[in-house]
């Protein structure tokens, strides 16, 4: 795979293509200063990123859209150069809500279409505007999940030209097979966005997806933040790993750059999230070196098969995806 800083798109199963590195824009709305996302997207585009990964529930899509318009007006990029991924949240799985939810994202971004729209998690929650619905006792309010019906509503959005490609996130093999075997399937999922890094290499899921022309997009490709609400903090931080740091010394790179290069060489798309200008630039500097076959095997051997992001608060949901082996 001959990838460079200016040419790093890889083909998707529907004939479209995706840049192999993107900027993740996840943020905690309550604690993230206004404008942080816009500044980060500007720096990313100026650095050479063309893929931005976002979601309506991050509450910063308006900043992403403003930055796109600004950079297009400057002549830095054209709309067709930019690849934006949005997400359908768990409270909007009801088929009648799918198109209005996507249209709301388009309105906030002020775009005519987005490049990729994915089901964020395979678990449905009580429909409505409350993102994390619970009852008065704090119990999560779940909703009957019908992934095939949700998918049909997404297919109609693609047919209407609102989105170029459709995908999923946090799906296990069984949930992917449910869609792939759906009677009358019009559009296959082009990607499955999942946690993937040297401590959690996902070999079986990766192989299954490759067999079905589904790209793996790696979230938390550098390990993750240490927020105990989301994260298994008993795991050691990935970027402190001895092997990754010794390879970093060899190539005059950081452990983070080694980790990103590892996944890119496996054909896995990476979307490291950062609002730190230096790290945004650093994460992109992965096209001027390659790891040897031996080094790739050594990094693969670091796999502990343990997730940082377990979503344990929803493990009693009938569609909780992480009980299966993969």
Curated annotation (Swiss-Prot):
Instruction: From the UniProt record, list the reaction(s) this protein catalyses.
Output: 5beta-cholestan-3-one + NADP(+) = cholest-4-en-3-one + NADPH + H(+); 4,5beta-dihydrocortisone + NADP(+) = cortisone + NADPH + H(+); cortisol + NADPH + H(+) = 5beta-dihydrocortisol + NADP(+); corticosterone + NADPH + H(+) = 5beta-dihydrocorticosterone + NADP(+)
Query: One GO biological process from the UniProt record?
Result: bile acid biosynthetic process
Known regulation of its activity is: Subject to inhibition by high substrate concentrations. Inhibited by testosterone concentrations above 10 uM. Inhibited by the primary and secondary bile acids chenodeoxycholic acid and ursodeoxycholic acid.
Task: Detail which positions bind NADP(+).
Answer: 22-26, 53, 169-170, 193, 219-224, 273-283
Top-level taxonomic group: Eukaryota
- Enumerate the SUPFAM superfamilies for this protein: NAD(P)-linked oxidoreductase (SSF51430)
Gene Ontology CC:
cytoplasm
Q: Which terms are listed as keywords in the entry? A: Bile acid catabolism, Cytoplasm, Lipid degradation, Lipid metabolism, NADP, Oxidoreductase, Steroid metabolism
Q: What is its EC number?
A: 1.3.1.3
Q: Name one GO molecular function term.
A: Delta4-3-oxosteroid 5beta-reductase activity
Asked if Lipid metabolism is a keyword of the record, the answer is: yes
- Where's the active site on this chain? 58 (proton donor)
> Localized where?
Cytoplasm
Identify the residues that bind substrate: 26, 58, 89, 120, 132, 230
Checking InterPro entries in the record gives: AKR, AKR1D1, Aldo/ket_reductase_CS, NADP_OxRdtase_dom, NADP_OxRdtase_dom_sf
Q: Does the keyword Lipid metabolism apply?
A: yes
Q: Which Gene3D superfamilies match?
A: NADP-dependent oxidoreductase domain
Known role: Catalyzes the stereospecific NADPH-dependent reduction of the C4-C5 double bond of bile acid intermediates and steroid hormones carrying a delta(4)-3-one structure to yield an A/B cis-ring junction. This cis-configuration is crucial for bile acid biosynthesis and plays important roles in steroid metabolism. Capable of reducing a broad range of delta-(4)-3-ketosteroids from C18 (such as, 17beta-hydroxyestr-4-en-3-one) to C27 (such as, 7alpha-hydroxycholest-4-en-3-one).
Q: Which family does it belong to?
A: Belongs to the aldo/keto reductase family.
Q: Which PANTHER family match?
A: ALDO/KETO REDUCTASE
> What name does UniProt use for this protein?
Aldo-keto reductase family 1 member D1
Species in which this protein is naturally found? Oryctolagus cuniculus
